[in-house]
């Protein structure tokens, strides 16, 4: 089609065709109207990489650092480059729409998807979102900013009612979306599951029409989160353009036609309005086909798995890393120290959080591998303590045939798919699908096959392989399912997940609790493993995740006390040691929130024992949101490494060895303990609602207002060099603020980057205001001794307004203000006062 004319096509569509465009046809595709040349459009997760169209057996992809890590770069140019790379990844999957970035707020540290979003600060979150969206859409790929709005916890997320003041809604939770619309104009926005002040977001006229469409003049497409549509008429009338996934539940021809024919429900104009926005999204895709080369329903490939991709992922991961402590400049060295490695995350490939952010990565470099790569030789290692939430690893540690070499081709398990359960199969029944499984966490809810009815995905999987222990000892096997499962070892049933099921956290909270069995195994002996799995409809639990999924695991049992002693002995034996600890994609995941800020299991005991044995041990933490460090005063060197994507291990090694001078800054405040955080009393859905009791005082706004100390403040991060900052010029007009800041690298050894952070304070406001608020930042790279001037231009109304609930408008108060420039919210190096002579009121962008 040479010209995709939205209005012309709208006029030519019949009613049934229009209705069909109001919902997806499956998990990842919109409806094709062949008669009019309207193509199907493929969408794909997600926030830190492009999975493609399969949770199960998906084509590998590049994995980026998680959202809080990306925002900790404080680098708009780098984030735009990351968005461009995400677009290239999307093109390799023939997906025209990326379901990201995630732009919700961290009210507190426990949110299951807190790692996915950028920041506790709405300005940083909004500008990070804008940069990533610009990168994506500049390459012709549509972005989807999500989840609109107040989707800030997982507890009862489909029904939870977020009770939030109008001022907090505007200043904190809507603000990142407003900034994204203003600066990047995303093609799509995804609505949230939850309610806000009584109305489901996916059918809220106030949010979708009054604010997004009328006030902000946004003209993109609104899609639901998956299974996040709750009505037919209200959602159509109030602005939700398309329901995901398909097949539709709420927008069948019968339901929509009934609503059209019922008095005071919806009109043909309402349907046309929704279809028009879907067509505008498709127009964006079609108009960019020459640039993207995307093929409708085309194959998915790993063509973007290149050295250039790896190098950029490594750069992004390294620049996200935050140096938290470096007492006596212990890490300020470029020598090739032979670090000996300890810790549960050292050999784990903790590349991302869980849920929609998880994916089958091209590869993942573990921290241990990164250090070995840097040194060119193996180093001593011990685990010290386990930190898993549940046991995985069966597929990763099994062989298809133990008699053959243990290479990549022979690694994993064979999965055979059948229409009947094993006890009902005839001897000659052949599987309708056979594949190899390399990952133990298997999600099948988007599995498609001609033999499987998508509305009732009833099938069975036989999983087989061989496990060969590397040591004598006790081993723990595990199984959890959404569906049903039986785990056999040498044809003996060891775990039953078919009968007497108990609900647990698996499969977004729809599946079972983990069940385990400890067995004594012999080194080198071949053990036949078999799992008989029945798909989602066979589950004894009520849930709605289609074909479901399963996770089978095995791990060597350890004596915790003995392992901690081993770790301390290793640390004491060597001058240089690094301890890699943290969370993973089970502790931080979509579907549920963390219960506390604790490091898992006996991690803290491990850290204390190692630090006592060797105080110079470098601690590296991996998490997407804060954890408690009860041993903080004892640590001399501490690094926050987030979930670093494919290149996490190489990036960590680059920072430890001084090849990259750390330049990340914390995208959220780091409290000492859970009870300190602003949402402590209100981070749970109770009686169907969650009260945003901290109001506008989120993150550092709260800590500063209460003068409550934190372990590490917002915007904080050390370097291997030092900097000076000073405001050299400052001008205020009726609508602009211009700030010039001189920045000097005062070190003589390392080039490095510093982030100039600009905060504003209202000194005599008539309403309660934060002590200060971030409204500008700029990253600058300097050679030793070099000085540069950074110029930052801001709109006056964006810098100092608050939302006046009484008037329903933004309000710039006449009065006195303070601009503060520093390297964190707690390290202000230069200030200037200024005055605004008259009040200003405004709405919109």
Swiss-Prot record:
Keywords: Carbohydrate metabolism, Cellulose degradation, Glycoprotein, Glycosidase, Hydrolase, Polysaccharide degradation, Signal
Gene Ontology MF annotations: beta-glucosidase activity
Domain of life: Eukaryota
Keyword Transcription regulation: no
Enzyme Commission no: 3.2.1.21
Known glycosylation sites: 66, 304, 438, 621
UniProt keyword annotation of rRNA-binding present: no
Active-site residue numbers: 225
Known catalytic reactions: Hydrolysis of terminal, non-reducing beta-D-glucosyl residues with release of beta-D-glucose
Stored Gene3D superfamilies: Galactose-binding domain-like, Glycoside hydrolase family 3 C-terminal domain, Glycoside hydrolase, family 3, N-terminal domain, Immunoglobulins
Pfam families: Fn3-like, Glyco_hydro_3, Glyco_hydro_3_C, PA14
Domain named PA14: residues: 408-568
BP-aspect Gene Ontology terms: cellulose catabolic process
Pathway(s) annotated for this protein in UniProt: Glycan metabolism; cellulose degradation
Family to which this protein belongs: Belongs to the glycosyl hydrolase 3 family.
Subunit structure: Homotetramer.
Protein name as annotated: Beta-glucosidase
Species the sequence originates in: Kluyveromyces marxianus
